[in-house]
Amino acid sequence: MKHLHDLPAWSKLWNHFDDSKTLHMREMFEQDPQRAERYWLQVGGLTLDYSKNRINDETMSLLFELAREAGVPERMRQMFHGEKINTTENRAVLHVALRNRTNSPIVVDGEDVMPKVNRVLQRMGEFAHEVRSGSWLGYTNQVITDVVNIGIGGSDLGPLMMCTALKPFGHPRLNMHFVSNVDGSQLRDVLSKVHPETTLFIIASKTFTTQETLTNALTAREWFLNHAGDEEAVAKHFAAVSTNQKAVAEFGIDTANMFEFWDWVGGRYSLWSAIGLPIMLYLGEENFIEMLNGAHLMDQHFINTPLERNLPVILALIGIWYINYYGGGSHVIAPYDQHLHRLPKFIQQLDMESNGKQVTLDGKAVGHETSPIIWGETGINGQHAFFQLLHQGTHITPIDLIASLEKRSNLPGHHEILLANVFAQAEAFMRGKTPDEVRAELKAQGMDEVRIEELVPHKTFSGNRPTNLILMDKVNPRNMGSLIAMYEHKTFVQGIIWGINSFDQWGVELGKQLAKTILGELTGETGPQKHDSSTERLINLYLQTNRK
């Protein structure tokens, strides 16, 4: 395979970095009136302004060269054609098939997967219609008012993020709840708000053996039966998203209410599949299909557009520029919309679980940085929390500022204030404030020269801080589908360039294996096992505390 450090463009970019690292965006804008127009893209309802980055035409040309040398176009083709690019698990990677609205065949192991995809989608729609219309009744013949999704990781973060983001499109009768943490308090809090007669539980676990999910599911089942008293009532209040029909049936769920997905759907890419059942229940089939349409639009742009005008590719390459050349170890997601407050955590899992890898596809140490730490918060809150570090800290931290052009509320003046802050932050990160500008400002306030010189270093902003401004014309299912697909493809492209597998997650396994051993010790089912002295001390502390 091709190793990044052996690619000619990798070395060319280092030479270019040495020549260009002192360039300031402020001067680049002053010298180039067409800069914003040139570094500007629109795809469907999304607009990307990437002009406020430490790039010029040579930077982008070399990055596109790097992408081609790394085999990005070929790898993209392989994914869309169902080839098994997840090599460590010998699986295809076909979340794009879940939103393939053309229904053109996508073949895996000689079988077109589209009939299966459409069959499950149709069953989801029928089920959602019954619940939303009120024809699905609980064991006391009451309509469903609350839906509790029990899952973890991709079975939780995607549906939770999308239901929260699109709350204005949700069914007014349905209250959505999500349980992922096995600590007990999250489930207890949810159960205290719902009534067994009107609650539908969705258990989302591919194998139906995930410890955290099954623990919560069994507790919810026990709570339900304590009220209902009849095991046959379980079938009216529990549905499953799984492939383990036997375990689902043993739980008491009618397998007619089990919705399957496939091993070529990774958890963090699964909200488009049956894992998205809570989304369809809340938003309805039509809006769910619109979400798929938006994702498909981005898929078609991604696979059919030259790299030079390809939105996910450009975002990926700019990220490579900062991570691997500037040493930018983190990336901020800052949505300026309260309903998008779950988006940073979703992107965090998507990016860090996909690309937090230390070896290449052929098992060699990568020898360079891979996934940055992804973090963030709604933009306005971030301005009064961590933006200080972004403006005047010592880190190079690229920021995605995400906003909607259309108002989401009828409250006068709010949206204009919001967008003024978005645009102002992007300009401030780019321009900064020079010492002379600070002096002039303080002098105009009547401050004496000595005090001015004391304050100048503190009030100076270096600027040259990179941002991507991502605007939706409105927050709706279609644009949210496009936005998430954009980030999926960005993540994929970066993984290709780094030479890693973006679709496995072996890093989650070791802790789970060790937890099984320790659990036996904590419950008394096994005697003491061999651990390091710290772990043994922690186990003993727990046992001593709970003997009291």
UniProtKB/Swiss-Prot annotation:
CDD domains: SIS_PGI_1, SIS_PGI_2. Pathway: Carbohydrate biosynthesis; gluconeogenesis; Carbohydrate degradation; glycolysis; D-glyceraldehyde 3-phosphate and glycerone phosphate from D-glucose: step 2/4. Its EC number is 5.3.1.9. The lineage of its organism: Bacteria, Pseudomonadati, Pseudomonadota, Betaproteobacteria, Neisseriales. The keyword Transcription does not apply. It is found in: Cytoplasm. Belongs to the GPI family. This is Glucose-6-phosphate isomerase 1. The gene is pgi1. Keywords: Cytoplasm, Gluconeogenesis, Glycolysis, Isomerase. Catalyzes the reversible isomerization of glucose-6-phosphate to fructose-6-phosphate. InterPro entries: G6P_Isomerase (IPR001672), G6P_Isomerase_C (IPR023096), Phosphoglucose_isomerase_CS (IPR018189), SIS_dom_sf (IPR046348), SIS_PGI_1 (IPR035476), SIS_PGI_2 (IPR035482). It comes from the Bacteria. GO terms for biological process: gluconeogenesis; glucose 6-phosphate metabolic process; glycolytic process. GO terms for cellular component: cytosol. Coiled coil: none annotated. The active site is at 353 (proton donor), 384, 512. HAMAP family: G6P_isomerase. The keyword Coiled coil does not apply. PROSITE patterns: P_GLUCOSE_ISOMERASE_1 (PS00765), P_GLUCOSE_ISOMERASE_2 (PS00174), P_GLUCOSE_ISOMERASE_3 (PS51463). GO terms for molecular function: carbohydrate derivative binding; glucose-6-phosphate isomerase activity; monosaccharide binding. It catalyses: alpha-D-glucose 6-phosphate = beta-D-fructose 6-phosphate.
